Regions:
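Polybasic/polar functional segments that serve as interface/processing modules
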Residues: 1-420
């Protein structure tokens, strides 16, 4: 039985941090270019995007743009909008797929027609608390096939990578053509998902304490996150009472279509962090160097990561990308899986666990039924061990639009699209 949804309100206009189900759902939709609309999807208005996000049970709280795309921090994760690509990533019990019909409707209104979709997620910690469309991967696949199956002859393809006996699995649905131009270079994305986070690191950086908090930008630097993305303009948040999100836009002109995003749920019992780097030219990606850097900052007890390469010759170049070696200091590889897509792409999936003896001493135990819920959290229980775990709170829907104050705090905003 699904637990009742927790009531969500803001205190002094501050949005409570996402929690419980850290694992994100992610959809990437590519569209055909429109010669009469060079801005493509970026012509979809802010009000229309707000409607799309409301359908998915989340909100836009900030936006940062460059010449290539717009990056939105959401109440639960992130949205990226390019002229011919949209990437939506949401955590908790958000209803990501419920936002797809509205997205396609407004894309059609600006003359954009979908040509490829890729949906990914890891295993849910509490799948029984997910909304109906995400109740199982079969349910998700049925929905995706109804909306995107026509993009591939014979329909799309679905895959589950990794062994259920060895931990988290990776779920993937893909349909359509990866490249509009045959000479287009393959692009890579790398998603790192971490649990059992280092307790000391979380308590020091990702809990908003009035006596020590300076700004979200300072948190990004002090926590080590800035060192991972030195060439990125970062839009960052420290939520109250805890939690962290950021979007990064590469500042270098040669690579300014690259984006990154990090989301952290630091609470005892369900600690989780994700770190993504996407839209990278294959020859520029050093997979294991990047993962080693991420692991050195967060020091998780467990982590999984997926490297996805999309392009007409993705399978040919994937060996070079993954040949650098899989050694990560302090960790042992539990499993590795590689899968070629039926439609121009390949994915590799890895699971690593801490092997240096520090996991039990310094990592957060992810326990069943929220038995170690933080007492100070607005959705904790006096007797958590005997309580049903509630849904991750849905976003607050009564704000017309949103922005953030100078210190990185989220607050409601009633400005125009241009101002927000």
């Amino acid at each position: 039985m699904v637990a009742a949804t927790a009531s969500v309100t803001t205190v002094d206009g501050v949005y409570p941090s996402p929690h419980f189900e850290g694992a994100e759902k992610r959809i990437e939709i590519d569209f055909h270019a429109n010669e009469t609309n060079a801005r493509g999807l970026r012509e979809v208005t802010r009000a229309q995007l707000d409607e799309c996000m409301a359908a998915a049970h989340c909100e836009i709280v900030s936006v940062r743009s460059n010449a290539k795309f717009d990056a939105y921090v959401l109440s639960e994760s992130s949205l990226f909008v390019f002229p011919t690509k949209l990437v939506l990533k949401t955590c908790g019990t958000t209803n990501l797929l419920a936002g797809v019909p509205t997205i396609l409707k407004y894309a059609s209104q600006v003359g954009m027609e979908s040509r490829r979709v890729k949906f990914t997620r890891s295993s849910f910690d509490k799948p029984d608390l997910q909304p109906k469309l995400h109740a199982s991967f079969d349910d998700e696949t049925i929905f995706l096939e109804e909306h995107f199956g026509h993009l591939s002859p014979g329909g799309g393809s679905s895959y589950i990578l990794g062994s259920k006996l060895k931990g988290v699995q990776w779920h993937l649905y893909v349909s359509g053509s990866a490249c509009q131009w045959q000479d287009a270079q393959p692009k890579a994305s790398l998603e790192v998902c971490m649990t059992h986070l280092n307790r000391e690191h979380c308590e020091k950086h990702f809990y908003r304490k009035e006596e020590t908090f300076v700004s979200s930008a300072q948190t990004t630097t002090d926590s080590g996150i800035r060192s991972i993305f030195e060439d990125f303009a970062i839009d960052d948040y420290v939520f109250e009472p805890c939690g962290y999100s950021m979007n990064g836009l590469n500042k270098l002109s040669a690579t300014d279509s690259q984006f990154s995003t990090i989301h952290i749920t630091p609470e005892d019992g369900f600690s989780y962090a994700s770190c993504e780097l996407s839209n990278v030219d294959v020859e520029e990606l050093d997979v294991f160097s990047y993962v080693r850097q991420v692991a050195s900052v967060f020091k998780p007890g467990k982590m999984v990561f997926a490297i996805s390469i999309d392009g007409v010759n993705a399978a040919d170049v994937s060996g070079d990308v993954l040949a650098a070696g899989g050694f990560i200091p302090g960790y042992s590889r539990v499993q590795a899986t590689r899968q070629e897509f039926d439609v121009e792409g390949v994915i590799a999936y890895y699971t690593y666990e801490r092997s240096d003896g520090l996991r039990s001493a310094h990592s957060l135990p992810n326990v069943a039924r929220g038995a170690a819920l933080l007492k100070g959290h607005p959705f904790s229980f006096a007797n958590a061990a005997d309580a049903e775990r509630p849904l991750t709170p849905p976003c607050v829907m009564d704000f017309p639009s949103s922005d953030h104050s100078d210190d990185g705090r989220w607050s409601g905003c009633s400005n125009t699209d241009e101002d927000c």
